[in-house]
A protein has these predicted regions:
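Residue-level detector of conserved catalytic or cofactor/ligand-binding positions
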Residues: 161-169
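Anion-binding (especially nucleotide phosphate/pyrophosphate-binding) glycine-rich loop
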Residues: 2-133
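Hydrophobic alpha-helical segments and helix pairs
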Residues: 116-118, 122-162
Length: 169
């Protein structure tokens, strides 16, 4: 169970309507399974992610970060902790010359579509993958002979210590 003080602290970082208590995870997974998370928080930007991670580490509250919830199995007992959702508010896709930049919450299918619309190749394999680009990068998602490691050149990472760094695979 998450204390009222922790919930109030979260509401100081994100709008109160973005903090949901006892939220059924089946509403947030593509398999439509999973019991309630003690708390689920919709993130709107990288700054909120950093602040919340730092705070939760300080108060020693367990948390996990998800995107679209694709291929995610959650117990019927739910999740004892806080689920941070990197979703549609963190889904910007931008094309620059021959490069495409996408935030973690962008759907892989939308990133593949943007690439196609701008004459960029290499992401065709991602068109049918239901996950987010963030999750795809973490697990090296792939299909039909293509995978993320073949197309990713740079990744900006917010690690568990809330340190932002850029890495090149």
């Amino acid at each position: 169970m998450i204390s009222a003080a922790v919930i109030e602290a979260l509401k100081e970082i994100v709008p109160a309507d973005k903090v949901l208590l006892q939220e059924p995870m089946k509403l947030h997974t593509t398999f439509r399974i999973g019991g309630p998370a003690d708390c689920l928080v919709y993130l709107e930007n990288e700054e909120q992610l950093c602040k919340i991670q730092k705070y939760l580490r300080l108060v020693d509250v367990p948390y996990t970060v998800i995107g679209n919830g694709s291929n995610l199995l959650v117990s019927d007992q739910g999740y004892a902790g806080i689920v941070l959702v990197v979703g549609k508010h963190m889904s910007r896709i931008e094309v620059r010359d021959c490069y495409l930049e996408a935030e973690a919450g962008a759907l892989m299918s939308q990133v593949a579509k943007a690439a196609k619309e701008h004459g960029l190749t290499g992401l065709e394999f991602a068109a049918g993958i239901p996950g987010t680009i963030g999750g795809g990068a973490v697990m090296n998602a792939g299909a039909y002979g293509g995978e993320m490691s073949q197309v990713v050149t740079t990744v900006t990472v917010v690690n568990r210590l809330s340190l932002i760094h850029i890495s090149e695979p």
